[in-house]
């Protein structure tokens, strides 16, 4: 039941993004949205997909995720967008969200980045307070340190802390490469490649909004 509700919520958020993009040109310029799908290819478990949909207007941020905190679990988020800098540009979105499905709880979270020259650092995280068993509360994190040698190419290192899947290490890490073509973004991540049974994550995303 929780998964159906989560899928419905993500669908409604995606439809809301599409509806916003269909407004007049003046109004549309204030909106941006994205849809991203990461497919995890696991060596010893079943593969799974993790979709995320976001919608932003000026300082407002709304986000929906599925299979992020746990399989068969959805989460919805609201946040506040902050940004600044020129030579060193930064963005920060503090958020609060709720998860429901196989895992239920509330979480403070964030997403942020800082960029200088051709280097950038991106990080997102949350601390989920499990409402069923407090001992199961957990800190999630995904971080990337990257170099962009060309506008269409981004390479670097990634770290991830999650409990969605089994891992020999508390924090998985590895290299990644990303490609951008207009609004389309694709990336491939290889986590724990030095431990004999690496996890591959394949990401594809699309950014909506007026140019």
Task: Locate each region found by the language model.
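Onset of an N-terminal alpha helix
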Residues: 28-32, 46
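Short, solvent-exposed secondary-structure boundary motifs
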Residues: 40-44, 134-135, 165-168
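A mid-sequence, solvent-exposed acidic-amphipathic segment
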Residues: 133-146, 156-160, 164
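N-terminal non-globular leader segments, chiefly Sec-dependent signal peptides
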Residues: 102-104
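Cleavable N-terminal export/targeting peptides
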Residues: 1-29, 209-211
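Polar low-complexity intrinsically disordered regions enriched in Ser/Thr and small residues
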Residues: 5, 9, 17-19, 88, ...
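Transmembrane beta-strand segments that form the barrel wall of outer-membrane beta-barrel proteins
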Residues: 31-41, 53, 58-70, 76, ...
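Feature captures outer-membrane beta-barrel proteins of Gram-negative bacteria and organelles
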Residues: 47-58, 73-93, 106-123, 137-149, ...
